[in-house]
From Swiss-Prot:
Gene3D superfamilies: Alpha-1-antitrypsin, domain 1 (2.30.39.10), Antithrombin, subunit I, domain 2 (3.30.497.10), Serpins superfamily (2.10.310.10). The reactive center loop (RCL) extends out from the body of the protein and directs binding to the target protease. The protease cleaves the serpin at the reactive site within the RCL, establishing a covalent linkage between the carboxyl group of the serpin reactive site and the serine hydroxyl of the protease. The resulting inactive serpin-protease complex is highly stable. Glycans are attached at residues 62, 99, 162, 229, 263. The record marks 374-375 as: Reactive bond. The keyword Acyltransferase does not apply. Belongs to the serpin family. This is Serine proteinase inhibitor A3K. The keyword Ribosomal protein does not apply. One of its GO terms (cellular component) is extracellular space. Residues 360-381 are annotated as: RCL. Coiled coil: none annotated. It comes from Cavia porcellus. It holds the Pfam family Serpin. Contrapsin inhibits trypsin-like proteases. The lineage of its organism: Eukaryota, Metazoa, Chordata, Craniata, Vertebrata.
């Protein structure tokens, strides 16, 4: 088998960031069955992808904070799939939880196009923006179809880049990311490989205000119980009133929905004592969708920590556990991107940041429910590890997914 030098593609998501590089062998193209799937089903697949992603990250470390944007990572991968062939193509779309025997690929990309259009609509109540950038080596010629599709379907901007000067290329990409995330993510790209010829960048930025803000005067320093042996002091925000809150016996957790102004909701899950693992094993996307449909309210005292956390992940490790292996190896077939040279993803990076305070949030992812009512309003004190999702409920899209094990860890 003739050898070839591998050139790198860099992928950044949520920021999500992929680096492509050149490799050796040609892979036969496999035709994906093309059957109809309504584009509104894309968010449902993203919910299952978020669930799988969280499972993998928890397996890697069950004692660390987790925070990521499934929609950002999925968008970046979907763009790569436009230029992928054969098994490389199949692995990417399967990992995104699309059934390739039932879904026409055109419906998948149309679904992403509609979703991104919806998410980027101007809102007076909150700010939610996404963006996609292609940084191209000055000597790299993209295939016309790939170039047209990523611009039309994903509204990607193309930027000529001098990758022969890695420092200047890093500066250019980082400036784009910093601007898109309003200064929240800076200097993400470092040590850019000399073989990089293309960087694909996706970012998402959200700033929302609580529909019912917390009163700063009620915020006090209190204990957060990291585990049986560790306690840390954190500022706890407090609020008393009518809340969409209930206890779910299936996941053995309290469920609290806090709405932002606009179409975004935060879903907080507080497991019963010692039941975090049970929560993570039994929570399903279907249950999450049921939670979001709950409208009943009950009186409750809510205590929630102010926090600022982030997550930075090597996507090569995470995505391999989800079944995406070819695209990072010499078996990659990304011949739909360019014919100039064989490509593979040489680096993938995802970074997401979250801030929750009294005013709101700033972030750059089958059984009967039982509402427990008591004579006295329950105290929902999130003073121990908890799980949360931030969801655009007009589309049921998981924007961010997180688990707080220690709110003092940035």
């Amino acid at each position: 088998m003739p050898s070839a030098i591998s050139r790198g593609l860099l992928l950044l998501a949520g920021l999500c960031y992929l680096v492509f590089g050149i490799m050796a062998e040609d892979i036969q193209v496999a035709q994906v069955p093309s059957q109809h799937m309504p584009s509104h089903k894309v968010p449902r697949s993203l919910a299952h992808f978020a669930h799988s992603m969280h499972r993998v990250l928890t397996q890697q470390s069950n004692t660390s904070n987790i925070f990521f944007s499934p929609v950002s990572i999925a968008t970046a991968l979907a763009m790569v799939s436009l230029g992928a062939k054969g098994d490389t193509h199949t692995q990417i779309l399967r990992s995104l939880e699309f059934n390739l025997t039932e879904i026409a690929e055109a419906d998948i990309h149309d679904g992403f196009q509609n979703l991104l259009h919806t998410l980027n609509r101007p809102h007076s109540e909150h700010q939610l923006t996404t963006g996609n950038g292609l940084f191209l080596d000055q000597n790299l010629k993209l295939k016309e179809k790939f170039s047209g599709d990523v611009k039309t379907l994903y509204h990607a901007e193309a930027f000529p880049t001098n990758f022969s000067n890695p420092k200047e290329a890093e500066k250019q990409i980082n400036a784009y990311v910093e601007k898109g995330t309003q200064g929240k993510i800076v200097d993400l790209v470092k040590d850019l490989g000399a073989d990089t010829v293309l960087a694909l960048v996706n970012y998402i930025f959200f700033r929302g205000k609580w529909e019912k803000p917390f009163d700063v005067k009620h915020t006090t320093q209190e204990d957060f119980h990291v585990d049986a042996n560790t306690t840390v002091k954190v500022p706890m925000m407090k609020q008393q009133g009518m809340h969409k809150a209930f206890h779910c016996s299936t996941i053995q957790s309290w469920v609290l929905l806090l709405d932002y102004e606009g179409n975004v909701t935060a879903l907080f899950l507080l497991p019963d004592e010692g039941k975090m693992q049970h929560l993570e094993e039994t929570l399903t996307p279907e249950l999450v969708f049921k939670f979001l449909r709950k409208t009943e309210t009950m009186p409750a005292y809510v205590s929630l920590p102010k926090l600022s956390i982030s997550g930075t992940y090597d996507l090569k490790e995470v995505l391999r556990d989800l079944g995406i292996t070819n695209v990072f190896s010499g078996a990659a077939d990304l011949s739909g991107i360019t014919e100039d040279m064989p490509l593979k993803i040489s680096k993938g990076l995802h970074k997401a940041l979250l801030t929750i305070d009294e005013e709101g949030t700033e972030a750059a992812a089958a059984t009967v429910l039982e509402a427990t009512r008591t004579a006295r309003p329950p105290r929902l004190s999130f003073n121990k590890p908890f799980f949360f999702l931030i969801i655009d409920h007009s589309t049921d899209t998981p924007l961010f997914v997180g688990k707080v094990m220690d709110p003092t860890k940035k």
